[in-house]
Amino acid sequence: LLAVMGPSGSGKSTLLSIAGGLERPTRGSVYVNGIDLAALDSVRRAEVRRRSIGYVFQDYNLIPSLSALENVEMPLQLDGVSPSKVREAAMAALAEVGVAELANRFPERLSGGQRQRVAIARGLVGNRSVILADEPTGALDSHAGEQIMLVLRNHIDAGAAGILVTHEARMAAW
């Protein structure tokens, strides 16, 4: 787990966008599982990104017309995973971050911290080999933030690589 800290506007989120294949670098390479994302066309880059990278967006990026469960299911559906396995994995991810009971709620009916947990569950679902987390504890209280950092650490310890962007030194120490 690599933690990145810096002042606002210093390029931390841009780094994650490039590392995650959301943006192409102006020069250089970005390798994920031995594949240079920068060398791929946008369709192939999106395919590799979907299968390999779990991204936790700073602004949650939840789809308002989908329930919490449906938001978490989406990456696996796009990967062609069977519907029964999609539902099981999404519910497990929601439980892992402590919001399984909110599965049928829509984002507008969730608090900021609950939205953040749903976004984290979506980033973790499917056992991605790379986890990119942009301020994953920003909307959480101290206790909830510690719980989420433990969840992220468990995924890293299980073999995922991760980049954490944070303003909090105590979170970077994880």
What label would you give each PLM region?
Residues 1-174:
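ABC family nucleotide-binding domain
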